[in-house]
Structures are given as structure tokens and as C-alpha cells.
Amino acid sequence: HTRLVRSRGLGDVYKRQAMDLFRAIDGIDSIRLSGTQENGWYIQEAKDAMESGKMIYAGKYNAPDYELILDEGCGLAIESTMIHHNPEVEEKLEQFGIPVMVERSSYESHPLGRTEWMKLYAVLLGKEDVAEKAFKEQTDKLDKVLTSDDKDTGKTVAFFYINSTGAVNVRKNGDYVSNMIELAGGKYVPEDTGESDNALSTMNMQMEEFYAKAKDADYIIYNSTIDGELSTIDELLAKSNLLADFKAVKDGNVWCTGKNLFQETTELGTMIEDIHTILTTDDDSLDELAYMHK
């Protein structure tokens, strides 16, 4: 029975995707050690495993509890690329005879390229058939959107959050989130945010510049994963009253992501489906989808 350690940086939700990939193939039981504390998980199965003691906290990715890791007989450490900032941790684990695998799913620009990483973990656990089935569910959802009559809506979508200094954090063009919007039949704005160079797929811009480039967006999807979910337009406007002039705000086309958006890599087909529904629905009463709410 392989004991796996996942050392993950606490502050970085983007790097917790491996846990969701293990969840999708019913493999969370094979993870004994976590680099994220219980309150850092939105994935229920991970929370439950930590609560019951099946999974235990083994220190942050850059300061793991080596003694605990050795005592637990860990057979493989799965790290995010954050480990490259602390090569001494990787060296030490390998000195102790623990192989280290660096998880690079976050470098995939096609959303389902990220989801497909579940097949790799399935090979480790002998669950290839489970992974094939779960992956096909997501590709089927994407195919359905891509072959629908309204696959190209021409609607523009801004996806952003406002940080504590009042700057607007947007995705770069070619990043997997802007690609999800394009695959869903939308057009991501602002258009000229530069290509994602993988190392950093987001950038900050001043509100005035964002206003000039995105105020006519047909839809706003507010990224709530960093500073918590919004439930009203007033909460959005409290972040910047300039948003009141945005077309999407005036038209009532403002949606907000759920907090678990970036921890759930295995459902990116469902997320694309959600965005497509937002762009094509005529149902004004629709205000709740799998990963978004109005």
C-alpha cells in the first residue's frame, strides 16, 4: 500500500489540483500526508479524511515534517512546481529514499489537458478504467458544447477579481480560464493582456485601464477564490463604484465563481458547460449552476 505525501503550499489554491484528481479516481485513501491543513481544503473527501485522521498534516511544502514522513513510510512525494523554489526539500526527500514527482498540470493551457492528469495517477493506483470513464464524462460535455447550434455566441466575458490594493487581477490570453471562456463560445476580455507564459497566468491592471477595456463586456464572472464569494451586486460595487457603469452590471449579467473553482481540476468540462449556459440561457430566473451563481 503506497503511502503518498502531498506537500502543497497553503496559500496557493492553484496547486492543490492533484487532490481532486485523486478524488475523481476514488484514490484519496492512498494519500496519507497532506501539505495543506484541514481548513484549507474545499474538497469534502480531503476534509473528511483529515478529520477522521486517515490523512494527516505533514508540514508545508517548503518545511515538511521529515520525521513524520519517514515514520509513516511514505512511498512517493507529489509536489507542485513551487518545490523548485526550495530544491533542498526535494534533495532531502530523495536522500531519505522517497521519490519526488513534480506535478505540472498547472502548465496545461487546454482545460481538459489538466483533467487528463488523472490518468497518470490512475496508473499509480491501478485504476485506469475509473480514470478513462471520468475523463470521458468531461470530454463528452465539452463535445456537446462544441457541436451545439449556439457554440459561438460572440458574447464578451470579463473574468477578474479586485485585490486589496484596488487593482484588477485578470487572466492572460491563452491561460486555461480564458481558454474555457473561448471553448464555451464566449470571447475573453480584455483582449490584450499578453500571452500566458505558464509561470504566471494572471496580471494586475489599474481600475481605470480595466474600465476602458472591459466596461462593455456582455458578462462579468467575478473570481471569488481569493477573497471570498460575493452574493450581491452591492458587494461587488463596494470593491469599486466604477463597476456600476459596466454593461454587464446594468444588464444584470454578473456571475460569481464558487470558492472551489481552482481546487476542482476534474470538472473543467462541467465548468465550460456552466459558462456556455450563462451565455446562452433565456431563463432569467436561472441563478445557480454547478460552479457559478448569479
Task: Show which residues each predicted segment covers.
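Short, small-residue-biased leader/transition segments that mark boundaries at the very start
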Residues: 1-14
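Acidic/His-rich segments in extracytoplasmic proteins that coordinate ligands and/or metal ions
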Residues: 17-124, 208-227
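Structured C-terminal subdomain patch of bacterial secreted/periplasmic proteins
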Residues: 108-126, 130-137, 219-294
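His/Asp/Glu-enriched short active-site or ligand-binding loop at hydrolase and phosphoryl-transfer sites
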Residues: 177-200, 221-224
